[in-house]
């Protein structure tokens, strides 16, 4: 069923115009490694304020349960701990403890969605984006008879890896086979061209664009591994969210 709510037609120069109001997307946000929900809320504050004011999206925040050291760019004292990841990060290939940690995080996030949802979509930054990509792909693979939209009808990735495991030399090995199962839902990708994970964020975008070319959005900026706050970049990101909202509203 469409989320769009048509208002009464109005007329301009004898041409009927249908004014349509789309409700705000309700998104559950997943922070990066060595962060927490309050830090994520702080980093998203400029974007969230604009999106909520314009009734495009509203955010809720999940928090990981694996306590870690502060992540990249997280300065103790400036950002209060404790600091968390959703699972052991980065995960190592063939490591049973890491796989168990991912499985625990998977089950915990499904429980959060069941308890606090429903949500229209999920948003992930860095590690959080990699985890949500794995979550949705695994769920779609393991539950072929269940509509994945009970978890999310869209996804937003900010400077995110695809699902991967590190080899012994600490090189990410992307799980392309798992990524084939990612559902055909609208996605938005925000990618920094100066980011150290730019190559991997681009791969994630390209693979999902192949699955749903008409509903996969891309916003690039010149910054690094951060959630953009520059006003000009924010304008582009907000426009990307508007298109995402439209795609979700008219996806059925």
Curated annotation (Swiss-Prot):
Q: Spell out the SUPFAM superfamilies in the cross-references.
A: alpha/beta-Hydrolases
> One Pfam family of this protein, by short name?
FSH1
Q: Name one GO cellular component term.
A: nucleus
GO molecular function ontology, one term from the record: hydrolase activity
The active site of this protein is located at 126 (charge relay system)
Q: Give the enzyme class.
A: hydrolase
Q: Keywords for this entry?
A: Hydrolase
Give an example GO biological process: secondary metabolic process
Pathway it works in: Secondary metabolite biosynthesis
Documented EC number(s)? 3.1.2.-
How do biotechnologists make use of this enzyme or protein? Phomoidrides A and B (also known as CP-225,917 and CP-263,114) are potent inhibitors of Ras farnesyltransferase and squalene synthase. CP-225,917 and CP-263,114 inhibit Ras farnesyl transferase from rat brain with IC(50) values of 6 uM and 20 uoM, respectively. CP-225,917 inhibits squalene synthase with an IC(50) value of 43 uM and CP-263,114 with an IC(50) of 160 uM.
Q: What does this protein do?
A: Hydrolase; part of the gene cluster that mediates the biosynthesis of the antihypercholesterolemic agents phomoidrides which are dimeric anhydrides. Within the pathway, phiM releases the C12-fatty acyl chain from phiA. The pathway begins with the highly reducing polyketide synthase tstA that catalyzes the formation of a C12-fatty acyl-ACP, starting from one acetate and 5 malonate units. The hydrolase tstM is involved in the release of the C12-fatty acyl chain from phiA.
Give the record's family classification: Belongs to the LovG family.
Protein name per Swiss-Prot or TrEMBL: Hydrolase phiM
From which organism does this entry originate? Talaromyces stipitatus (strain ATCC 10500 / CBS 375.48 / QM 6759 / NRRL 1006) (Penicillium stipitatum)
**Quick one: which gene encodes this?**
tstM
């Amino acid at each position: 069923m469409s989320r769009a709510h048509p208002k009464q037609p109005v007329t301009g120069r004898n041409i009927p115009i249908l004014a349509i109001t789309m409700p705000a997307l309700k998104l559950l946000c997943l922070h990066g490694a060595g962060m927490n929900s309050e830090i994520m809320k702080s980093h998203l504050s400029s974007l969230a304020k604009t999106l909520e004011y314009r009734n495009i999206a509203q955010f809720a925040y999940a928090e990981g349960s694996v306590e870690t050291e502060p992540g990249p760019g997280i300065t103790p004292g400036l950002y209060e701990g404790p600091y968390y990841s959703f699972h052991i990060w980065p995960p190592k290939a063939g490591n049973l403890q890491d796989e168990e940690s991912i499985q625990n995080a998977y089950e915990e996030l499904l429980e959060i969605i069941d308890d606090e949802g429903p949500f229209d979509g999920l948003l992930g930054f860095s590690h959080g984006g990699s985890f949500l990509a794995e979550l949705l792909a695994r769920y779609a693979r393991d539950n072929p008879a269940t509509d994945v939209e009970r978890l999310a009808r869209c996804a937003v990735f900010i400077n995110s890896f695809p699902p991967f495991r590190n080899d012994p030399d600490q090189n990410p090995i992307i799980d392309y086979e798992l990524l084939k199962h990612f559902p055909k839902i609208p996605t938005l990708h925000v990618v920094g061209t100066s980011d150290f994970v730019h190559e991997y964020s681009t791969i994630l975008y390209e693979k999902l664009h192949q699955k749903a070319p008409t509903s996969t959005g891309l916003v690039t900026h010149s910054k690094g591994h951060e959630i953009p706050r520059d006003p000009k970049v924010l304008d582009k990101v907000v426009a990307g969210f508007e298109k995402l909202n439209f795609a979700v509203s008219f996806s059925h």
